Amino acid sequence: EEIMMSYSNNDHFDKKDDDFLSVIDRLVNLQNEDSINYAYYNIKHDDAPLRWSEFFQRSKMKTFADSFNAFFEDMEYFGMGFTDRHKKVIGFTKYGNQIDMQSLSSGEKQIIERTVPMLEIMTEQKDNLLFIDEPEMSLHPKWQEKVHSYFKQLFTDTSGIQQNQIFMASHSSAFLKKAMMDETSLVVRLINHNGKVEAQRIEHPTYLSAVTFAEVNYLVFDIVSAEYHNQLYCQIQNRHNLSKVKACDDYIYHHQSFISNLHQKTSGYGRVQYNTICSYIRNAIDHFDNGHTYTEDELRCSIQLMQEILR
């Protein structure tokens, strides 16, 4: 395997307008490269030349246009050319109206800035390795959710097969949520233990029926939350048809993972008595006016128990 590219956010990102114009010039060069490759292909295959419309389907600019247009809902790249006065025009529309390059937002510019270097080194060779650091930088959270599939599509051929392996390092919950929902992606958490970095795989599927931001924050960033706690509690109820909190409390209490000296915490509501730390915290969250409090350690302990039950 060949390392195709090691790409850090320090390489191309703190850009001024002049720097962005240089990226646009490189985009123009990619179109010129496509034209040269088309001519060269037909010289080599003069017995069976391709029409431009056929060759364009596997060109770099077609790859750029398809990925860019799929990423932005209200924006489109439609080509480049020259005006009657020989002024270079890069074709972008937003909400159906043509705009100039300077009207692009910082996030829109960044997508172009990140894409151009990748297209420059893209070849027909397969099974390369691509490294991208912080692909979500400067992007709106909605775009952070989409950037994972954007880079995958960039290296997917016309038959829908991804041709290169991509490694992306991210601290974005929105990005990681999409990655964890993709069965073809492997999410690995890096943990620093006294100066030694260890890798921990985040398994598919997770504990919930659908990946949530609260679960991403816990599994990847080790952030405990009341939201994730009660999502796990509801998951146990739904999985085992336990509509009443008391029924769920009894189920947890009699589960083989329940350890009395760790997980028992008696509480009550009216005549109903609950015996588990999970129900105690669940009720403290849902009925915050009941005066019940809990520590972060108790919250973590309860989450870990419910994960074991759902494993």
Please annotate each region the language model reported.
Residues 1-7:
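Phosphate-binding active sites in nucleotide-utilizing proteins
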Residues 9-129, 159, 269-272, 276-281, ...:
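Extended helical coiled-coil dimerization/tether regions that scaffold
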Residues 36-46, 169, 203-206, 223-228:
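Low-complexity, flexible helical/coil segments
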Residues 153-161, 174-311:
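RecA-like P-loop NTPase motor core
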